From Swiss-Prot:
Species annotation: Columba livia (Rock dove)
Source organism superkingdom: Eukaryota
Protein name: Hemoglobin subunit alpha-A
Residues covered by the Globin domain: 2-142
Tissue expr: Red blood cells.
Amino acid sequence: MVLSANDKSNVKAVFAKIGGQAGDLGGEALERLFITYPQTKTYFPHFDLSHGSAQIKGHGKKVAEALVEAANHIDDIAGALSKLSDLHAQKLRVDPVNFKLLGHCFLVVVAVHFPSLLTPEVHASLDKFVLAVGTVLTAKYR
């Protein structure tokens, strides 16, 4: 997925505004993922999956930090997430569709907390961005 200059600007602007809340948003997105797509819980049998769990919040923060890292290096997402891509492809072996599902959940959480930010144009840019991140994370599966 090719991000235009306008897409990149939109993504950077959103991440600048969500700033310090990214970790909380990541936790909420992960919890939403588990509720909406219960099959995704299979990768976390050792987690306390109850509402507000410290483990969900902690992993959600890692997810958000990866998205922030990708946004900060939007011209080289593959380079920024290379180690994470290796981890998911070689060790964790997460089904690639789950990245798309989690990306969608993250967009929903951003929309809930920052509705004025999510204009149709910005929504399209963020959608392209999370798809690009998912593509990078699954690139080493082959």
